[in-house]
Amino acid sequence: MSNVPTAVKNIIIINVLVMIMTALNENFMYEKFALFYPTSPFFHWWQPLTHMFMHGGFWHLLFNMYTLWIFGSVLERVWGAKKFLVFYFVTGLGAALIHTGVEWIQMQTWLTEAAQGSYAAQTSIHALKMTPTVGASGAIYGVLMGYAMLYPDSVLTLLFPPVSLKAKWFVLIFAAIELFTGVTGTGGGIAHFAHLGGLIFGFILIWYWKKKHTLYSRMD
């Protein structure tokens, strides 16, 4: 990893170490560092940050860290380590905010139904409070948005299916898929609105830097 930029390298190392720690004491790591709904008895104020370093399994970790290595390295070489970290954490925290906001909307509906005696709503409320969210995917989607906005016409090729498209179209397709699956509830067990949140906050931050004419300024 000698050619991997400093910030990206350190993020990958921390994620791998946290995965090892989770394997050694899964219950403790999830209860303390995964992201729970704010009214859950397991919620702690630091979880919007720490959940970004936890993953649900080896393949979840591998996909996120591989994507970070490929696209995050490009962004860090343009922006410098400090500016890349600002972008990474803003998009990751923004993803957590959007995800929790959507959960809050769901919760209001269920609370109303539960007050009317709905057992299904009561079960849904309990499940939401007890179900943690983990992963750097929100920040990773932010990184993808950042890359697509800096290099919109660069051609990317997926391994499966073997399709080549410009980066800007890839991101738009990903956004459409996440919106559809999030709204329809398909693809359960995946925080689709967190992915959308990462894309949204990535877009906003890039737009802000462009407006301030600081997009290509470095912070090392």
Q: Across the structure, where does each feature detected by a protein language model lie?
A:
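A detector for small-residue-rich transmembrane helices and their helix-helix packing motifs
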Residues: 1-220
